[in-house]
Regions:
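Catalytic-core elements of nucleic-acid end-processing and repair enzymes
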Residues: 1-282
């Protein structure tokens, strides 16, 4: 049975912005929806929390552009910045090149990868909080969303990623015809703590010969769940295991984060399109 045909107590199917989405009123219904896809899929199914239902699913590096020239320009600048980290951080010699870009994405760089998680409650937290950045992009703060008439829901995307192939030479890396997937808890050293705290994985779509990587990854969306924001806050409660301090461990605890912050790699205003390793207020 297709996901869009399932019937779960405590939920109903609705249409919003061209999507058929599952509107969930009970926490058990949320868990059942997530579990159904994971059990019935031949691919890996993961979660991504969103505050808004967007028509596209773009990685941060590709947002706000539409031309190949702009795409390749950003990719070139991003790769140059990654190489700067490789040159000055000996930690990058402790893992393979395939993990460098997704790791830096996890700490703030804008890349071709998208963050996903395999814990539904972590995804829900990201759907309930919004990130606020200083103008220069260096300092990041998360704040609780305010429930009002235009800000009533949290969304969780269910994302499919290929698991057909993996290599012993690439721990934590899977790929198939459509996507690549990296689990940083395996691919990167454990002193990079944030991926473990967030149950963090990343995926990206593969390109086709002659056209390159697509700007929009929405072809991998397998379902969308909507939760009333007020109920989502109630389900999350006030526990410390899912909160800013635990999901974004300070550099005092996250030695990998400290290495990046102390690397000496600089970011200038012209680097805005490729992001920065943020200092997160926790």
């Amino acid at each position: 049975m297709a996901f869009e045909d399932i019937n779960i107590i405590g939920s109903e199917w609705i249409h919003e912005n061209g999507f058929k989405i599952l509107d969930v009123e009970e926490s058990h219904a949320l868990i059942m929806a997530a579990g159904y896809l994971k059990h019935n899929s031949l691919e890996g199914v993961y979660f991504r929390g969103q505050s808004t239902l967007y028509p596209e699913l773009r990685p941060t590096l590709y947002r706000g552009i539409d031309s190949d020239s702009a795409k390749y320009n950003r990719e070139s600048r991003m790769n140059s910045k990654i190489n700067e980290y490789r040159e000055v951080c000996s930690a990058f010699s402790k893992f393979e090149d395939y993990a460098a870009e997704p790791l830096l994405q996890h700490y703030g760089l804008k890349t071709t990868w998208l963050d996903i998680v395999d814990n539904i409650w972590v995804a829900l937290w990201f759907a309930c909080y919004e990130a606020k950045c200083t103008r220069d992009g260096h300092f990041l703060h998360f704040q609780k969303r305010v429930v009002n008439e235009v800000n009533k829901y949290a969304y969780i995307y269910l994302i499919g990623a290929d698991l057909e192939y993996r290599k012993k030479s690439k721990p934590g890396y899977w790929h198939g015809q459509s996507t690549e997937l990296v689990d940083l808890r395996i691919a990167a050293p454990s002193y990079f703590l944030r991926p473990h705290a967030q149950h963090g994985l990343l995926f990206r779509c593969k390109g086709v010969e002659g056209a390159g990587r697509p700007l929009d990854y929405s072809r991998q969306i397998r379902g969308v769940v909507r939760i009333p924001l007020e109920k989502a806050f109630d389900w999350l409660g006030n526990g410390h295991t899912v909160g800013i301090h635990s999901l974004f461990p300070p550099a005092f605890y996250d030695n990998g984060y400290k290495i990046l912050l102390q690397s000496g790699v600089t970011f200038y205003p012209r680097d805005k399109e490729i992001g920065v390793v943020h200092t997160v207020g926790a």
